């Protein structure tokens, strides 16, 4: 069934409230485990319907933020989603207190109960107004980003459309593009500062209402981090500082030499070669056709999956006016359909989206047989393993897109993945400091950003882009506003994806089997258990980075990048 035919209906809150209440009541009054399972199944059906409507609004609103109908529905969803979550929470209470708990654990697994108990620690009806305010502020940020109209090259462009100019072979074009983008953020500095300040305050208020000292521990629990805490993440950041930051500096020096510039500036970072980066050699349609070939040849499972996606119009890839920036994958439960949203811009990023978001989509397609919604996706850090590993597992097909620039693409891809990690931990350390010190001023935050940036990105130099010397670079990082503490997950997953890259070069078949099994498990196991089942070393364990990173360095050192 085509995505355009997926039916949307406005959710009636009172009706849903009555349905939940009735079903939870029959779950609690059930005289045997069979009765509870029957009620449980009906609750899942209701939750799937709600989730489907929420997702359809979210997708259609992000495709066209100017569509008045879905703009209004999106505001309505922001308003009611915390209340709807409250209904699920009421079910969790009934579930963990079930008199047939042992039998239910046998049927559904203990993880569901651990997740339910964890959620009960971060939600109560008392914080619904705060969660609504958080949603409203998050949407306000997205709209502000989408509102960018930058006059450049005789056109009016949004932020996604500015990316090719920031990667131009002409240094002067790069400088001007970087300045124009920075000016947008500088001109709106007060509004970005105010939105973030309000978000920090409202999140802190929620955490304190729920009995936490600050938002840090509360935020971790919201992300269902059952196995690690802020202390362990701090230890991991230390490993990054010791094992990756020196290599980061080395790679930036190589880049400086390749580009033949006296000093590598911020606006040079995105351009890897004077001859230009490796860009795909064709149109979006051409890319999609090669994508079909790639997934057909990769495995029978990926062939079936990608055929389903293309035949049902489940990819929205082109950048257009009023469309939100970025890329994501989501899932529409009633249709058992993943959906990929992206903004193609003619750069290698288009291919990364095609592999990265397809990694997410492929995983949920493999695990869509789970009835329990909690098992469709794993927790965030595990989710990112599928997407980032798919980027590497598709390497043998990169020649379809890049032709004689394939070696260049691979060098850029692998080095960029490594260069990303210190930036990822910069974002993470910044957020920990922000939520540990919620009362500081926006100016303090901007100064702290620059200080942490210096620690993990010692080569960064903003050159003539004076606006960024004021510590506003992070305004463009959507996760800092809308998904606190999520960003470190990309770096943890990157370390796991590096291991898949290493394994695929040693034994491709075995690497694919490990990956496929990981996808099939969905969210039915915890992060640490999933890593174990895929034969991956845990990034938190001392020595993991020291074991993985040298193999990446060895490959990068073997490339004659001066002649690519």
Roles of regions detected by a PLM:
Residues 275-334, 347-348:
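Auxiliary, metal-adjacent structural segments of Zn-dependent hydrolase domains
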Residues 122-123, 181-188, 228-234, 269-280, ...:
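Glycine- and acidic
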Residues 196-207, 212-213, 251-255, 359-369, ...:
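Long, well-ordered alpha-helical segments
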């Amino acid at each position: 069934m085509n995505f355009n035919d997926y039916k949307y209906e406005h959710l009636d809150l009172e009706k849903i409230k009555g349905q939940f209440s009735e079903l939870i009541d029959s779950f609690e009054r059930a005289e045997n485990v069979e009765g509870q399972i029957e009620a449980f199944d009906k609750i899942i059906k209701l939750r799937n319907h709600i989730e489907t409507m929420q997702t359809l609004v979210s997708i259609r609103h992000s495709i066209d933020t100017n569509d008045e109908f879905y703009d209004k529905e999106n505001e309505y969803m922001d308003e009611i989603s915390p209340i709807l979550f409250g209904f699920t929470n009421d079910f969790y209470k009934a579930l963990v207190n079930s008199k047939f708990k042992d039998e239910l654990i046998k049927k559904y697994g203990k993880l569901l109960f651990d997740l339910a108990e964890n959620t009960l620690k971060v939600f109560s009806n008392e914080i619904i107004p705060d969660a609504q305010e958080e949603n409203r502020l998050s949407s306000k940020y997205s709209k502000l980003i989408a509102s960018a109209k930058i006059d450049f090259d005789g056109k009016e462009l949004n932020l996604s459309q500015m990316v090719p100019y920031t990667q131009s072979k002409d240094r002067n074009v790069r400088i001007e593009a970087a300045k124009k983008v920075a000016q947008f953020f500088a001109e709106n500095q007060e509004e970005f500062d105010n939105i973030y300040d309000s978000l920090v305050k409202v999140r802190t208020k929620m955490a304190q209402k729920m009995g936490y000292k600050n938002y840090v521990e509360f935020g971790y629990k919201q992300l269902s981090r059952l196995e690690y805490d802020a202390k362990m993440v701090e230890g991991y950041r230390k490993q990054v500082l010791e094992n990756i930051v020196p290599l980061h500096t080395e790679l930036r020096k190589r880049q400086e030499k390749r580009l033949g510039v006296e000093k590598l500036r911020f606006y040079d970072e995105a351009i890897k070669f004077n001859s230009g980066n490796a860009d795909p050699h064709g149109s979006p349609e051409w890319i999609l056709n090669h994508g079909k070939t790639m997934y057909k040849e990769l495995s029978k499972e990926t062939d079936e999956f990608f055929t389903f996606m293309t035949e049902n119009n489940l990819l929205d890839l082109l950048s257009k006016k009023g469309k939100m920036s970025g890329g994501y994958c989501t899932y529409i439960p009633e249709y058992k359909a993943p959906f990929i949203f992206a903004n193609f811009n003619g750069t290698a990023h288009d291919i990364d989206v095609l592999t990265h978001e397809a990694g997410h989509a492929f995983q949920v397609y493999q695990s869509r047989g789970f009835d329990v919604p909690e098992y469709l996706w794993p927790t965030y850090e595990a989710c990112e393993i599928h997407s980032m590993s798919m980027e590497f597992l598709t390497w043998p097909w990169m020649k379809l897109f890049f032709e004689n620039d394939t070696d260049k693409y691979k060098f850029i891809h692998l080095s960029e993945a490594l260069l990303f990690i210190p930036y990822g931990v910069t974002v993470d350390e910044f957020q920990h400091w922000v939520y540990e010190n919620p009362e500081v001023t926006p100016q303090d935050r901007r100064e702290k950003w620059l200080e942490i940036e210096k620690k993990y990105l010692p080569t960064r130099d903003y050159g003539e882009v004076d606006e960024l010397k004021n510590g506003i670079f992070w305004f463009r990082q959507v996760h800092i506003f809308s998904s606190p503490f999520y960003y470190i997950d990309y770096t943890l997953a990157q370390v796991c994806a590096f291991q898949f890259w290493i394994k695929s070069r040693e034994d491709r078949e075995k690497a694919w089997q490990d990956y496929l099994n990981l996808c099939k498990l969905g969210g039915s196991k915890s992060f640490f258990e999933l890593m174990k089942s895929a034969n991956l070393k845990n990034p938190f364990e001392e020595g993991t980075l020291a074991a993985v990173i040298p193999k990446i360095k060895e490959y990068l050192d073997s490339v004659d990048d001066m002649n690519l």
